[in-house]
């Protein structure tokens, strides 16, 4: 990949944390990109670890329209699982691949503004871009920020933010190219076949038909929002697929392109 000024924002799902080989492969790809002058910013979820920790503490996981409901009593556990354990597992994999990384959250460096998204969801946040100084400094050093989706309101209250939405906001903030990586190769049609490209109308139709639902609906809508805001396609792809990672490292299109 040729050196360019655009930041590649990689959003990784929680399932990656349970696949050591997948993490190693992804970090090796990121290391090669960084060595080639590409700035890389990683944003992560950690839903599976959150679910485990909640269950261990006798609490249940509740979701509303694909988004995690976060009661106040669950916030310390969710913050620990995301900003703590998940973040450090990824940082460990990055270190192993020779990447200098900075573990951070949305609360760091005055990076975003946060507010309650919807009272029905509890302490779930909605964030908007605020100040890119901190991120741009880290990236300018050739380091890779690894950002969890825990944000903070002005009164110090922690909020849990959907990681796809967090990645969208950070991509907007740094003017980056967004790739949403999950454990599926992209958006699949009703027959399980990969859809190479989608626009807003096609997405709305597939949501209405129930083909795109729950977590993938949140993911695709976040991708569409950033595609429209930045006037460029956003990719939904898989960290499981080695060929997609190789193509990604070369700057090629992978998975499903969400068109503005």
UniProtKB/Swiss-Prot annotation:
It catalyses: N-acetyl-L-glutamate + ATP = N-acetyl-L-glutamyl 5-phosphate + ADP. Substrate binds at residues 46-47, 68, 160. It is an enzyme of class 2 (transferase). It is found in: Cytoplasm. GO terms for molecular function: acetylglutamate kinase activity; ATP binding. Keywords: Amino-acid biosynthesis, Arginine biosynthesis, ATP-binding, Cytoplasm, Kinase, Nucleotide-binding, Transferase. GO terms for biological process: arginine biosynthetic process via ornithine; L-arginine biosynthetic process. InterPro entries: AceGlu_kinase-like_sf (IPR036393), AcgluKinase_fam (IPR004662), ArgB (IPR037528), Asp/Glu/Uridylate_kinase (IPR001048). Pathway: Amino-acid biosynthesis; L-arginine biosynthesis; N(2)-acetyl-L-ornithine from L-glutamate: step 2/4. Its EC number is 2.7.2.8. The record marks 11, 219 as: Transition state stabilizer. GO terms for cellular component: cytoplasm. It comes from the Bacteria. The keyword Kinase applies. It holds the Pfam family AA_kinase. NCBIfam families: argB. Catalyzes the ATP-dependent phosphorylation of N-acetyl-L-glutamate. Belongs to the acetylglutamate kinase family. ArgB subfamily. This is Acetylglutamate kinase. The gene is argB.
């Amino acid at each position: 990949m040729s050196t360019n000024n655009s930041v590649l924002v990689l959003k990784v799902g929680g399932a990656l944390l349970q696949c050591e080989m997948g993490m190693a492969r992804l970090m090796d790809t990121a290391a090669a990109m960084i060595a080639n002058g590409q700035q890389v910013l990683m944003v992560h979820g950690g839903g599976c670890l959150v679910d485990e920790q909640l269950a261990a503490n006798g609490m249940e996981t509740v979701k509303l329209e694909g988004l995690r409901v976060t009661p106040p009593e669950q916030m310390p556990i969710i913050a620990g699982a995301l900003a703590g354990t998940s973040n450090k597992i990824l940082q460990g994999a990055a270190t192993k691949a020779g990447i200098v990384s900075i573990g951070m959250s949305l609360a760091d460096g005055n990076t975003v503004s946060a507010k309650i998204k919807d009272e029905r969801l509890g302490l779930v946040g909605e964030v908007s871009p605020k100040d890119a100084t901190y991120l741009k400094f880290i990236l300018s050093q050739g380091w890779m920020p690894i950002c969890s989706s825990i944000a903070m309101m002005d009164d110090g209250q922690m909020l849990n933010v959907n990681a796809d939405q967090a990645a969208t906001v950070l991509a907007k903030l740094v003017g980056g190219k967004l790739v949403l990586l999950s454990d599926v190769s992209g958006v699949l049609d009703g027959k399980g076949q990969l859809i190479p490209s989608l626009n807003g109308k096609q997405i709305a139709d597939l949501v209405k038909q129930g083909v795109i639902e729950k977590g993938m609906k949140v993911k695709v809508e976040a991708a569409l929002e950033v595609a429209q805001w930045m006037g460029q396609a956003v990719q939904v792809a898989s960290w499981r697929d080695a060929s997609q990672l190789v193509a990604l490292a070369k700057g090629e299109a992978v998975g499903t392109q969400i068109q503005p």
